[in-house]
Amino acid sequence: GGGWNGWNGLGGGWNGLGVGWSRLDGGYGGGCGSYGGEGIGNVGVADELPVGGVTAVGGRVPIIGGVEYGGPARAAGAVSICGHCAPTCGCGRAGLGGYY
């Protein structure tokens, strides 16, 4: 697929170009306001983004602009996005609750 490094080969996601994760909505970027969705400014990581445990997002993460990584993004535990096009939470626009 055309996703982020062909993530699971399921779609264009992450940049809003395809159906993305499990084809629930616009994908890991295409729908639900997208991963570059709502707000102001950019999120830039110039080096490393280490996650040693679990990063949980229980509400909304509004971002507008670019999400850019200049180095590796490493997750030693689990990185879960619940409510943003995840099969267990879904997307508001897909009628599954979640992000909206």
From Swiss-Prot:
It comes from Bombyx mori. Residues 1-33 are annotated as: Left arm. Residues 82-100 are annotated as: Right arm. Residues 34-81 are annotated as: Central domain. The lineage of its organism: Eukaryota, Metazoa, Ecdysozoa, Arthropoda, Hexapoda. Keywords: Repeat. This protein is one of many from the eggshell of the silk moth. It comes from the Eukaryota. Belongs to the chorion protein family. This is Chorion class A protein M2774.
